[in-house]
């Protein structure tokens, strides 16, 4: 027996064909699959910050150049003013500057009545007059208080800017005086359009405990007014506080002893009969 006598069927193998068309059918790859989005955002922020810093630096340089130019112009103007002054005026200015400097040094010993850099300084002026003038100028330099009108908010008034308990009490007393005057001028408008609603609005921000205190205070006022009204009513009606409102005074009773009168009359009649009448 030999291997040649055996028949073997060798399976045919099909060679896998590779073509460019198969490559075209592959899924498309991302162009930048390894790019980090956070890195891109960070670089973008850095670029924006850099541009902003460059812009700020450029703006600052421009401002510095502008200030330098203005300073040069100012220096040139002062220099021209000095050049135009004649020699006599120059000497006078130097003398005045020296006197001013000496007076300032001496004024340090007398309460700081300095005169430096004052073009209106008069060498012959008395120090007291100058102090009064400086005080008046300082007072005039203060900002004037705003003029209050009907449209001005109440907060502009100094009274409505309290900072401590004493100032709050001062505000309360001022308001009470003004409100009482309004109530006397127009009681109807005061009660219907101001008083009642004002009490409600003023009590709105208070706590529950404070609102109860307000109610207790109002109850005391109610009792006082009821008592005063009752006394006024009694006084008008001519009564007394214990007799009731409008009750007239009781008239004294006239005593008539009827039984005594009849007794007296009966006795008189019996006295008129004689003994002969019964005979």
UniProtKB/Swiss-Prot annotation:
Residues 34-74 form a coiled coil. Residues 40-67 have a biased composition (Basic and acidic residues). One of its GO terms (molecular function) is translation initiation factor activity. It is found in: Cytoplasm. Component of the eukaryotic translation initiation factor 3 (eIF-3) complex, which is involved in protein synthesis of a specialized repertoire of mRNAs and, together with other initiation factors, stimulates binding of mRNA and methionyl-tRNAi to the 40S ribosome. The eIF-3 complex specifically targets and initiates translation of a subset of mRNAs involved in cell proliferation. Component of the eukaryotic translation initiation factor 3 (eIF-3) complex. This is Eukaryotic translation initiation factor 3 subunit J.
């Amino acid at each position: 027996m030999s291997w040649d006598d055996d028949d073997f069927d060798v399976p045919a193998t099909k060679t896998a064909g590779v073509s460019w068309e198969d490559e075209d059918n592959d899924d498309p790859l991302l162009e930048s699959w390894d790019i980090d989005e956070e890195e891109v955002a960070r670089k973008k922020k850095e670029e924006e910050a850099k541009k902003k810093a460059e812009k700020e630096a450029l703006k600052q340089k421009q401002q510095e150049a502008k200030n330098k130019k203005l300073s040069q112009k100012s220096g040139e103007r002062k220099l021209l003013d000095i050049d135009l002054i004649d020699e006599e005026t120059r000497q006078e200015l130097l003398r005045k500057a020296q006197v001013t400097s000496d007076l300032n040094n001496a004024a340090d010993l007398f309460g700081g009545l300095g005169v430096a850099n004052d073009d209106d300084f008069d060498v012959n002026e008395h120090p007291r007059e100058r102090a009064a003038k400086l005080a008046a100028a300082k007072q005039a330099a203060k900002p004037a208080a705003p003029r209050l009108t009907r449209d001005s908010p109440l907060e502009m008034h100094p009274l409505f800017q309290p900072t401590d308990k004493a100032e709050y009490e001062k505000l309360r007393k001022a308001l009470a005086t003004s409100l009482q005057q309004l109530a006397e001028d127009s009681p109807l408008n005061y009660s219907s359009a101001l008083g009642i609603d004002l009490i409600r609005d003023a009590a709105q921000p208070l706590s529950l405990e404070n609102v109860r205190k307000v109610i207790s205070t109002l109850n005391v006022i109610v009792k006082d007014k009821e008592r005063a009204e009752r006394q006024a009513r009694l006084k008008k009606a001519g009564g007394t506080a214990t007799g009731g409102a409008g009750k007239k005074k009781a008239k004294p009773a006239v005593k008539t002893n009827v039984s005594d009168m009849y007794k007296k009359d009966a006795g008189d009649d019996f006295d008129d009969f004689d003994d002969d009448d019964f005979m």
